[in-house]
Regions:
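N-terminal alpha/beta PP-like core and its mobile active-site loop of ThDP/TPP-dependent enzymes
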Residues: 1-163
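Single conserved hydrophobic/aromatic residue that forms the stacking wall/gate
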Residues: 161-171
Length: 171
């Protein structure tokens, strides 16, 4: 995966997670993140823990971070997937637990149109995260993920949130 132009956003995301030595990710599938789940299925370095609901993913990532000393990582879909993790994100922020939450988003041309399962993910998560991103350009995805891990694990450890527009995952 040397040339990012040859890979989908999902491939680039997985390479960035591998670069960060992530071995476990917690999550619940949904339409906006299915390309990531397809990529997870085709690799062998990352263990995915399927939870029953997104809130379980964020709390599992908290427990993983506390017990392992690593950054906890979770993956949720857009809309209700994001809103279901707000309590856990706030808990992680208040307890200084290093977590990176990755969510899907509707295609960038649909942002702001009340598309199916669209919500203002960055606005909703701004008060309960150390920093958040909305990645609309797949060429910035790897850089953003690496920066998220750096911020999550430096200073006061805390939570980072990144939302990937659906078209980035398919590029």
């Amino acid at each position: 995966m040397d040339n990012e132009n040859e890979f989908t956003g999902a491939d680039i995301l997985l390479k960035a997670l591998k670069d960060q030595e992530v071995d476990t990710i917690f999550g619940y599938p949904g339409g906006a993140v299915l390309p990531i789940y397809d990529a997870i299925f085709g690799q062998n370095f990352l263990k995915h823990v399927l939870v029953r609901q997104e809130a379980g993913a964020v709390h599992a990532a908290e427990g993983y971070a506390r017990s392992s000393g690593k950054v906890g990582v979770l993956l949720v879909t857009s809309g209700p997937g994001v809103t279901n993790v707000v309590t856990g994100l706030t808990d992680a922020l208040m307890d200084s637990i290093p977590i990176v939450c990755i969510s899907g988003q509707v295609p960038s041309h649909l942002i702001g149109t009340d598309a199916f399962q669209e919500c203002d993910t960055t606005g909703i998560t701004r008060p309960c995260t150390k920093h958040n991103y909305l990645v609309k350009d797949v060429s910035k995805l790897s850089e953003t993920i690496h920066e998220a891990f750096k911020i999550a694990s430096s200073g006061r450890p805390c939570l980072l949130y990144t939302s990937d527009a659906a078209d980035d995952l398919l590029c």
